[in-house]
């Protein structure tokens, strides 16, 4: 299986990952579970690569996935130019220990 189901049906999982990707690009750092971070990591990498292309078609593709237009603008004007000379590896995942309620492994995912 090429992806994690994360205990959700298809629509809920897709919405959750879109929200996480939008939040990560907006705040440049979020705290979530390890499984969610691994999934959103791939999405964020693809969005930043789209931002590096910089053309109108790439912007429209990013708009279909990210939920906020100002986040897409930030992606294309601030985030993507920062990684112009970097070939992938735009995010970093740092373990922060188990969550108090259910001992789920929590991580901090941030843009490098």
Swiss-Prot record:
GO terms for biological process: translation. It comes from the Bacteria. GO terms for cellular component: cytosolic large ribosomal subunit. One of its GO terms (molecular function) is structural constituent of ribosome. The keyword Lipoprotein does not apply. Keywords: Ribonucleoprotein, Ribosomal protein. SUPFAM superfamilies: Prokaryotic ribosomal protein L17 (SSF64263). Part of the 50S ribosomal subunit. Contacts protein L32. PANTHER family: LARGE RIBOSOMAL SUBUNIT PROTEIN BL17M (PTHR14413:SF16), RIBOSOMAL PROTEIN L17 (PTHR14413). Belongs to the bacterial ribosomal protein bL17 family. This is Large ribosomal subunit protein bL17. It comes from Desulfitobacterium hafniense (strain Y51). The gene is rplQ.
